[in-house]
Regions:
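Phosphate-binding glycine-rich loops and adjacent basic patches that engage nucleotide phosphates
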Residues: 6-9, 50-57
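Alpha-helix initiation and capping sites
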Residues: 13-20, 38-41, 66
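Catalytic cores and adjacent binding grooves of peptidoglycan-active enzymes
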Residues: 59-162
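Extended, low-complexity, intrinsically disordered C-terminal regulatory tails
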Residues: 23-54, 130, 138-140
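Intrinsically disordered, low-complexity boundary segments flanking structured domains
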Residues: 19-23, 34, 55-61, 125
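Active-site acidic/histidine clusters and adjacent loop/turn architecture
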Residues: 1-33, 116
């Protein structure tokens, strides 16, 4: 059984009840961190300017309060004591840093991260179904189970479909 750390607990407090229910259930069986829930206008504008998000304030699911979206990241167990940082969303520099720190190839780091992400996503999907909450993930915006047709991938992103 796992539990949320201080930062994840703070993020949890910004989430809508449906997301709280799902993450509270999921943490019982799978270890992950919550990176961000509610996003204020300044942060949303900054992310939009950097191309981190495609949605302007106030139209993002992170912009509601409580938030209808959360960014999550799995604890990558095969990377020894190195925890995938909250800043890692597939940025090449961070993949390179993890490869260097672990002595693994960048390709292997990606394989490990994507394997853990898929496991985490499956756990979240299962608890979404159990609790009757429809979710959308940042690797499959149109929810057709074809990740190759996406023009923007945001692996950490999970949102409630309303």
């Amino acid at each position: 059984m796992f539990s949320f750390g201080r930062k994840s607990s703070e993020v949890r407090e910004t989430l809508c009840d449906e997301l709280k229910l799902i993450v509270d259930s999921a943490i019982q069986v799978y270890n992950f961190s919550m990176i961000e829930g509610h996003r204020d206008q300044e942060t949303q504008d900054r992310y939009f300017a950097k191309g981190v998000t495609k949605v302007k304030w106030p139209n993002g699911k992170h912009n509601t309060y409580p938030s209808d979206a959360v960014d999550l990241w799995p604890y990558v167990t095969n990377l020894a004591d190195i925890r995938v940082s909250s800043a890692l969303s597939g940025h090449p520099d961070q993949i390179k840093a993890l490869a260097k720190a672990t002595g693994k190839t960048e390709k292997r780091i990606w394989e490990l991260v994507l394997q853990e992400y898929a496991t985490m996503k499956g756990v979240l999907m299962a608890f979404g179904k159990v609790h009757g909450v429809e979710l959308r993930f940042g690797d499959d915006w149109d929810r057709d189970h074809d990740r190759l047709d996406q023009s923007f991938i945001d692996l950490p992103h999970v949102e409630v479909v309303r």
